[in-house]
């Protein structure tokens, strides 16, 4: 902006000033003062009056004050001159460039930089000595004060009577006061080194490499900056170089370095309009950190731009780390889910501060100015427990993914899920969880996820960290900071980057690094066919002996292992049990609601003897979970009996318990796994379990407690042969699938019907009413998408949100069940081809027609391809409605 005038304009203004004030000699006197001040710059320091003479109006040559206005052409004039021009010419044109101004004088903005400079001059100490007590040093010959007006930049504008004076509006000139800018001049420091940080040499140093500073013992070395804990960059006799910190005694320490950070990655935003308050940068750029916004975001400045950026993208120096720690938000009340491993062991290199001493003061002044301005645009992180905050925030805000939120990004390209900003997705994917079992036999102690309290409102007893993930695929690192993934191993996730990459550490080796997020899945949502063996409570590190059952409340969910969580199967009763109590049965379509959550002590006290189990089983009906073999596990689970808690009426106490023996496990790759939900084992389809509130099996009646073991074995052999026949016939129709874990959704209504009746046989058609604890798409769910009614409900992530139990389900009920109804469909056209990345996904080719059945909140759709009739998942951005 132009503050000085050419002498042509000055001559015109001289007449106006003489006419208004009657002082014709004033312009000439002012010119003489300016020339004298310029000449005095060669021998003495420029005083305050000479500085103020440079800040004058180019029309009237009067000193500018805070009422000066800036025109759209960036020229600044005093208010009185602008008003006189409007009164005389009835329009406002710039006296310098003659550009017409379309607004009034009152609507013009003030010169903010001028206001700050004037304020700094007023606050400047007027004493004859400097703040340090020594007389003010004189500048070296030939140096003018013009660089101080431009933030230390070069140029001597305004030093000659014929040149205009400019004030730069760049970000480098946003100093808090003129005093801070004046101290950045290096010439006074050369005369008086006590004003600069310096140290005294304790030993002589000859220098070992080019660029080292040589000095002798006793030399006074000016310290320019601190490279790291071991080295300084200093100056001695006009020579600069590096010197070891142990060789000098620091007498005047370096000032506090400005909080800065070095960009580790490129940070760009796709939606410029929505994310206009984000600060974009490229790798290796140096940012100035202003303040912390929330757990994962900070506000910074790069050049003349101010915005927020993710902390994971920037390597902070010590000052920035202290600033971030100072502004760290208070942890939530229930913060046990946020436990994490120690961070990376690699030391963070300090970023070299700016060599000018005024940069720290300028940044601090700028920070104070913008601190209140950006509060209205701050973005918040939402943990898995802050349900109230999640529900109250707008979905348009950017929400930082916490390490406690088990969000799985199912995509081959980790950058494809960079924009996960939907608030409801976080509320669905990160429910609070309870611990159901604490006993284990493996040497690695890993927290195991169990059932979820969900929406019942029951407070959780024990919080479980959700940042333990299982590797679904092997990954070879491509860069030095990446972590190698081994399929089936466990990893602790420390941070989640916006581009879909995770930062974590291996629980086996402790090595940390970054890896793609779609290669791992949370332990709490590992599918039943996961890579690890399901574990039960053990005694002495081995499974329980035959005939011993483990009792637990169904509210406790499951006995989870490192790799998978075994869901509790719903109890199965016999026709005899229903015939005794026909009036106690709610409608068949109702579901079991868990009304109580277990404590950790209940889970630990589940191991009991056979006699104790039988005594407990006489109080409440029991259901059994048969042994289940995973794909990679050679071991089997012992029989587990579950009893409904505060749901079953005491009048059923006469029902005898059923004791189970381990049976040959059925691999999940068989047809039974494709048609059996993960919370009902394949052995249950053959009628092993007896005594439960729902489901009917006509194969056998429950025996009393005095039944001998050999009789049971003979019955089981017959049932086993029947089951194998059924599986042999179904295996030709079904294809085993092992889809990856996906984010859960909430369905408001669920209708369960006889899908198994046509796939396996009428014998197991009664086993159709149950709740599914997970949300992995299985074969039966894919059949439901093709037009059949779904076999089970998806009630949130690990949420067994059932209604009341069904006490009666005779075989005759199957005849009056409603017919399967078609799911809603929407026609979509594929606009971009998409290759499937897992068995749960379908291949899309450009131009294909897809019938969409469900739109998930993470942007993925489930639908059926018209070309081949296949049903599966695909990203919604690859299709369009028509």
Swiss-Prot record:
Pathway connected to this protein: Protein modification; protein ubiquitination
CDD domains the record matches: RING-HC_SH3RF3 (cd16750), SH3_SH3RF3_1 (cd11928), SH3_SH3RF3_2 (cd11931), SH3_SH3RF3_3 (cd11925), SH3_SH3RF_C (cd11785)
Quaternary structure and partners: Interacts (via SH3 domain 3) with PAK2. Interacts with RAC1 (GTP-bound form).
Modified residues (Phosphoserine): 400, 797
TM regions (residue ranges): none
Class in the EC hierarchy, top level: transferase
UniProt family annotation: Belongs to the SH3RF family.
Organism for this UniProt entry: Homo sapiens (Human)
Effect of residue 73 to A: Significant reduction in autoubiquitination
Protein name as it appears in the record: E3 ubiquitin-protein ligase SH3RF3
Span list, region Interaction with RAC1: 369-439
């Amino acid at each position: 902006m132009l503050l000085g005038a050419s002498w042509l304009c000055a001559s015109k203004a001289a007449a106006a000033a003489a006419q208004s004030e009657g002082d014709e000699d004033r312009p000439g006197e002012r010119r003489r003062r300016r020339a004298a001040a310029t000449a005095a710059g060669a021998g003495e320091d420029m005083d305050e009056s000479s500085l103020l003479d440079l800040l004058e109006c180019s029309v009237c040559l009067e000193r500018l004050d805070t009422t000066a206005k800036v025109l759209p052409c960036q020229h600044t004039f005093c208010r009185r001159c602008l008003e006189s021009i409007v009164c005389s010419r009835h329009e406002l044109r710039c006296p310098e460039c003659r550009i017409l101004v379309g607004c009034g004088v009152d609507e013009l903005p003030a010169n903010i930089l001028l206001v700050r400079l004037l304020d700094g001059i007023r606050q400047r100490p007027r004493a004859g000595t400097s703040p340090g007590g020594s007389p003010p040093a004189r500048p070296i010959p030939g140096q003018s004060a013009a660089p101080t007006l431009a933030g230390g930049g070069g140029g001597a504008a305004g030093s000659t009577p014929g040149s205009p004076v400019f004030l730069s509006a760049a970000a480098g000139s946003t100093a808090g006061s003129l005093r801070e800018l004046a101290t950045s001049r290096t010439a006074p420091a050369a005369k008086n080194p006590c004003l600069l940080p310096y140290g005294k040499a304790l030993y002589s140093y000859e220098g070992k490499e080019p660029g080292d500073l040589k000095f002798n013992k006793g030399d006074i070395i000016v310290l320019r900056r601190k490279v790291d804990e071991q080295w300084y960059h200093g100056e001695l006799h006009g020579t600069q170089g590096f010197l070891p910190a142990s060789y000098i005694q620091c007498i005047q320490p370096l000032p506090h370095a400005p909080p800065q950070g070095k960009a580790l990655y490129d940070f760009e935003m796709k939606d410029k309009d929505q994310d206009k308050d984000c600060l974009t940068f490229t790798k290796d750029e140096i940012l100035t950190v202003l303040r912390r916004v929330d757990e994962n975001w900070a506000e910074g400045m790069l050049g003349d731009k101010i915005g927020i950026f993710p902390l994971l993208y920037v390597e902070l120096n010590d000052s920035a780390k202290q600033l971030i720690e100072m502004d760290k938000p208070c942890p939530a009340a229930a913060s046990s889910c946020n436990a994490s491993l120690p961070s990376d062991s690699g030391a963070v290199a300090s970023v070299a501060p700016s060599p000018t001493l005024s940069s720290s003061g300028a940044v601090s002044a700028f920070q104070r100015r913008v601190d209140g301005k950006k509060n209205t645009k701050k973005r918040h992180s939402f943990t898995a427990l802050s349900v109230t905050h999640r529900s109250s925030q707008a979905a348009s805000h950017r929400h930082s993914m916490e390490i406690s939120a088990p969000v799985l990004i199912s995509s081959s390209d980790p950058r494809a899920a960079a924009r996960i900003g939907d608030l409801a997705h976080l509320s669905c994917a990160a429910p609070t969880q309870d611990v159901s079992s604490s006993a284990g036999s493996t040497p690695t102690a890993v927290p195991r996820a169990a059932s979820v309290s969900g929406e019942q409102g029951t407070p959780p007893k024990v919080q479980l960290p959700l940042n333990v993930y299982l590797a679904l695929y092997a990954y070879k690192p491509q860069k030095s900071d990446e972590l190698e993934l081994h399929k089936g191993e466990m990893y602790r996730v420390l941070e989640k980057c916006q581009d879909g990459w995770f930062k974590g550490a291996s629980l086996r080796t402790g090595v940390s690094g970054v890896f793609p997020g779609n290669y791992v899945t949370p332990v709490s949502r590992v599918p039943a066919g996961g890579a690890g063996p399901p574990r039960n409570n053990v005694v002495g590190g081995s499974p329980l002996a035959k005939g011993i059952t483990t009792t637990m409340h169904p509210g406790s969910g499951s006995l989870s292992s490192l790799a998978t969580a075994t869901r509790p199967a719903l109890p199965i009763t016999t026709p005899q049990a229903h015939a005794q109590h026909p009036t106690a049965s709610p409608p068949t379509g109702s579901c079991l609601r868990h009304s109580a959550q277990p404590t950790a002590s209940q889970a630990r006290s589940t191991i009991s003897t056979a006699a104790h189990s039988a005594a407990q089983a006489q109080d409440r009906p029991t259901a059994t979970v048969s042994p289940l073999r995973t794909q990679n596990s050679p071991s089997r689970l012992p029989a587990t009996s579950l009893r409904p808690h505060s749901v079953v009426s005491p009048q059923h106490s006469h029902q005898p318990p059923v004791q189970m023996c381990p049976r040959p496990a059925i691999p999940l790759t068989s047809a039974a796994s494709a048609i059996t939900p993960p919370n009902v084992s394949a052995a249950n389809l053959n009628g092993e379990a007896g005594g439960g509130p729902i489901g009917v099996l006509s194969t056998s009646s429950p025996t009393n407690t005095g039944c001998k073991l050999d009789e049971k074995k003979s019955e089981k052999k017959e049932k086993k042969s029947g089951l194998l026949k059924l599986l042999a016939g179904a295996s030709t129709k079904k294809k085993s699938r092992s889809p990856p874990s996906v984010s859960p959704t909430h369905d408001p209504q669920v209708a369960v019907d006889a899908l198994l009746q046509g796939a396996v046989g009428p014998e197991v058609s009664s086993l159709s009413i149950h709740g599914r604890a997970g949300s992995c798409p299985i074969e039966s769910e894919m059949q439901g998408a093709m037009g059949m009614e779904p076999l089970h409900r998806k009630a949130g992530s690990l949420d067994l949100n059932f209604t009341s139990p069904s006490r009666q389900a005779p075989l005759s009920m199957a005849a009056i069940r409603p017919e399967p109804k078609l799911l809603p469909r929407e026609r979509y056209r594929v606009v971009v081809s998409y290759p499937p990345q897992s068995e749960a996904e379908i291949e899309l080719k450009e131009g294909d027609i897809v019938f969409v059945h469900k739109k998930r909140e993470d942007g993925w759709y489930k639908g059926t391809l018209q070309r081949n009739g296949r049903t599966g998942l695909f990203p919604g951005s690859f299709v369009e409605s028509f």
